[in-house]
UniProtKB/Swiss-Prot annotation:
It is an enzyme of class 3 (hydrolase). One of its GO terms (cellular component) is cytoplasm. Gene3D superfamilies: Metalloproteases ('zincins'), catalytic domain. Single strand-specific metallo-endoribonuclease involved in late-stage 70S ribosome quality control and in maturation of the 3' terminus of the 16S rRNA. The keyword Hydrolase applies. PANTHER family: ENDORIBONUCLEASE YBEY, CHLOROPLASTIC (PTHR46986:SF1). The lineage of its organism: Bacteria, Bacillati, Actinomycetota, Actinomycetes, Micrococcales. Zn(2+) binds at residues 115, 119, 125. HAMAP family: Endoribonucl_YbeY. SUPFAM superfamilies: Metalloproteases ('zincins'), catalytic domain. This is Endoribonuclease YbeY. Belongs to the endoribonuclease YbeY family.
Length: 171
């Protein structure tokens, strides 16, 4: 199990943690992150998310996930695990609930934790090539996690790129 995972929930949605620890452990193993590396995952209210967006981005809007990297860490390799302070992933379950219309709430949570985790590792979707790389890896990670946890097949809606699915202001 991941050694320095800090989970926090101020959102009022008590089922946010469902398999979050297992997912993070899977991401550490799959992307060759040393299990002693720090990661924070927080589930917050829509008002808290808007406050973060205003403070850090100057934008007053809803968002489903934000990532705040600390150390510059990229995925490691089988022979060389990377170690450091990854940073924090912040998820708004209230927004997630609105987005998860045709698939289970927890599936959207998994997607956003993976998405946020990849941002902490330096992945981005600011241009077409980086977007393709990030979302291809994101889909593969989701599919592999679902297979590992016997969760069935993820819906196409959570494995396609965000520009093809309904959006509520993702970054």
């Amino acid at each position: 199990m991941t050694g320095l995972l800090y989970l926090q929930n101020s959102s009022g949605y008590n089922d946010c943690y469902f398999k979050t620890e297992s997912l993070v452990d899977f991401l550490y193993r799959t992307l060759f992150i040393d299990k002693g590396s720090y990661l924070g995952v927080s589930f917050i209210t829509a008002a808290e998310m808007r406050d973060l967006k205003i403070k850090h981005f100057g934008v007053n809007e809803d968002s489903d996930v934000l990532s705040f990297p600390i150390d510059e860490i990229a995925p490691g390799s089988e022979n060389s695990l990377v170690y450091g302070v990854l940073g924090d992933i912040v998820v708004c379950p209230e927004t997630v609930m609105r987005q998860a219309v045709r698939h289970p709430f927890e599936h959207e949570i998994y997607l956003l934790v993976v998405h946020g985790f990849l941002h902490l590792l330096g992945f981005d979707h600011s241009d077409a090539p980086s977007k393709k790389e990030m979302f291809s890896l994101q889909a593969k990670l989701i599919e592999d996690f679902f297979a590992l946890e016997n969760l069935g097949t993820p819906s196409e809606e959570i494995t396609i790129t965000p520009d093809l699915r309904p959006s509520l202001g993702r970054i």
